[in-house]
Swiss-Prot record:
SMART domains: t_SNARE
The protein's name: Syntaxin-31
Cytoplasmic topological domain: 1-314
Annotated organism of origin: Arabidopsis thaliana
Alphabetical keyword list: Coiled coil, Cytoplasm, Endosome, Golgi apparatus, Membrane, Protein transport, Transmembrane, Transmembrane helix, Transport
Biased composition (Polar residues): 164-181
Length: 336
């Protein structure tokens, strides 16, 4: 059974080539390459493009802040991603600073466009609402970042206090252990279970023949305990620099977090000032709208009064009809 479909791709290509030759299909990139067409674009297109870019940037920044919050919650004293958190914090801070500057430029562009006076009240209200929404979202993202950094700072302080508590507790508990280790233990040759005790005793030279046996045992135990004490001191000397380096790194990270919080606190007054200016602009727009409504009502009342005067003036209506009849007579008898 044969196929009921027919391949007409060649016909489609030939038709498109024919239409291109006769000029029925304009070039796709004609408007993009023509500078005059870009100048003829709508006045609010640049404002809308910038506003959309700022909105997209705020969305991406909020996603980064959410990731930073997850890292700050997952980090513990044994799994601390300090470097990654610092890099992400610096990146978010730069994004917020750039968005703040872009929002200031957008507001400047709005004021320049509104100064021309070629916009309706609906367009002015739209621009104002867009700017207010972007400012509110940026302020919310900044507040969220400040909360995350505050939580991070509190967690770091809690970890540092816990570490200091445990280190102090270990330092207090360590002296009894050293004293317990320094208690002299009986040497192996003093035990009756050592079968080679009689052979080892002649090999040891007597330290002092006139000294009692107890003093010799204490000297031997002190000599045997000396290497263990030296080993403990060496381990302690190796551990202390590591703890100091870790404490210094934590202190630097805590200082950087506090500095970021201070910088974000400096951004809030700028946003508050911008919101206040936007509110004043909205109040002025409302006042202008009230004045426009008053003027419209006055014009409407004046037109109604004029209409009443015209409708009540019959002599004027008779004059108008007389002029119309005279025109018809002149046209019919002299022109026709």
């Amino acid at each position: 059974m044969g196929s009921t479909f027919r391949d007409r791709t060649v016909e489609l290509h030939s038709l498109s080539q024919t239409l291109k030759k006769i000029g029925a299909i304009p070039s796709v990139h004609q408007d993009e390459d023509d500078p005059a067409s870009s100048k003829r674009s709508s006045p609010g297109s640049e404002f809308n493009k910038k506003a959309s870019r700022i909105g997209l940037g705020i969305k991406e920044t909020s996603q980064k802040i959410t990731r930073l919050a997850k890292l700050a919650k997952q980090s513990t004293i044994f799994n601390d991603r300090t470097v990654e958190i610092q890099e992400l914090t610096v990146l978010i801070r730069n994004d917020i600073t750039g968005l703040n500057m872009a929002l200031s430029d957008l507001q400047t562009l709005q004021n320049m466009e509104l100064a021309d006076g070629n916009y309706s009240q609906d367009q002015v209200g739209h621009y104002t609402a867009v700017c207010d929404d972007l400012k509110t979202r940026l302020m919310g993202a900044t507040k969220q970042l400040q909360d995350v950094l505050t939580t991070r700072s509190e967690n770091m302080k809690a970890h540092e206090n816990r570490k200091q508590l445990f280190s102090t507790k270990n330092a207090v508990d360590s002296p009894p252990q050293n004293n317990a280790k320094s208690v002299p233990e009986p040497p192996p040759w003093s035990s009756s279970s050592n079968p080679f005790g009689n052979l080892q005793q002649p090999l040891l030279p007597p330290l002092n023949t006139g000294a009692p046996p107890g003093s010799q045992l204490r000297r031997r135990s002190a000599i045997e305990n000396a290497p263990s004490q030296q080993m403990e001191m060496s381990l302690l000397q190796q551990t202390v620099p590591k703890q100091e380096n870790y404490s210094q790194s934590r202190a630097v990270a805590l200082h950087s977090v506090e500095s970021r919080i201070t910088e974000l606190s400096g951004i809030f007054p700028q946003l508050a000032t911008m919101v206040t200016q936007q509110g004043e602009l909205a109040i002025r727009i409302d006042d202008n709208m009230d004045e426009s409504l008053v003027n419209v009502e006055g014009a409407r009342s004046a037109l109604l009064q004029h209409l009443t005067r015209i409708s009540s003036n019959r002599w004027l209506m008779m004059k108008i009809f007389a002029v119309i009849i005279l025109f018809l007579i002149v046209f019919l008898f002299f022109v026709a």
